[in-house]
Swiss-Prot record:
<dbReference type="GO" id="GO:0005783">
    <property type="term" value="C:endoplasmic reticulum"/>
</dbReference>
<dbReference type="GO" id="GO:0051259">
    <property type="term" value="P:protein complex oligomerization"/>
</dbReference>
<dbReference type="InterPro" id="IPR008978">
    <property type="entry name" value="HSP20-like_chaperone"/>
</dbReference>
<dbReference type="GO" id="GO:0006457">
    <property type="term" value="P:protein folding"/>
</dbReference>
<dbReference type="GO" id="GO:0042542">
    <property type="term" value="P:response to hydrogen peroxide"/>
</dbReference>
<keyword id="KW-0346">Stress response</keyword>
<dbReference type="InterPro" id="IPR031107">
    <property type="entry name" value="Small_HSP"/>
</dbReference>
<keyword id="KW-0732">Signal</keyword>
<feature type="domain" description="sHSP">
    <location>
        <begin position="69"/>
        <end position="189"/>
    </location>
</feature>
<protein>
    <recommendedName>
        <fullName>23.2 kDa heat shock protein</fullName>
    </recommendedName>
</protein>
<dbReference type="Pfam" id="PF00011">
    <property type="entry name" value="HSP20"/>
</dbReference>
<comment type="similarity">
    <text>Belongs to the small heat shock protein (HSP20) family.</text>
</comment>
<feature type="compositionally biased region" description="Polar residues">
    <location>
        <begin position="205"/>
        <end position="215"/>
    </location>
</feature>
<dbReference type="InterPro" id="IPR002068">
    <property type="entry name" value="A-crystallin/Hsp20_dom"/>
</dbReference>
<dbReference type="GO" id="GO:0009651">
    <property type="term" value="P:response to salt stress"/>
</dbReference>
<feature type="region of interest" description="Disordered">
    <location>
        <begin position="183"/>
        <end position="215"/>
    </location>
</feature>
<feature type="signal peptide">
    <location>
        <begin position="1"/>
        <end position="27"/>
    </location>
</feature>
Amino acid sequence: MASMRTAAAAAMLACIAVVLASTAADGALLPWFGGGGARDEAVPELGLLAAADPFRILEHVPFGFDRDDVAMLSMARVDWRETGDAHEVVVDVPGMRKEDLRVEVEDNRVLRISGERRREETTEQKGGGDHWHREERSYGRFWRQLRLPDNADLDSIAASLDNGVLTVRFRKLAPDQIKGPRVVGIASAGGDDGGKKSIGGAGEGQNQQAKKVEL
């Protein structure tokens, strides 16, 4: 019984290690990412976050993922490049069609890319006599998300798929187009609300809906 528990614990640690490695370039765990530094500048920040609270990684992996899904997480590698006037996110999705993929952008400036590669039904599954000598290809679901910078033009996001490579592009806003923080006036103690501004009604911002990007 003790050996079974030890094996289960080792398997869980291995899965967490795989997910940590696969999300090293993933903005899901970072307050902001993609600001013109080195391509792997997020790795030290991720390490600090993991050291502070190593179980926060579980907040960003959907429940219900199995071993195949963890393998797909390591396959869906992401590159993020910033040019003079645009951002470009490139994801490796070998063997997947556009119908298998979903690209969304949420109101809180989070770009979410997900997909599923399904196993093909074989004659063995249909009751035939197929025999597998080797099975190394990865199947399952993946789920990546990136927090976009303030200069991202959310209305310009477009996605395309070519030879197993998904590319998501969006323009950069000019400095004078970037919305800064909203200044809220403070009422005086005497009740004068001349400078007081509303901060929104009940439930404001609670029902954010993701915008789907067509491939």
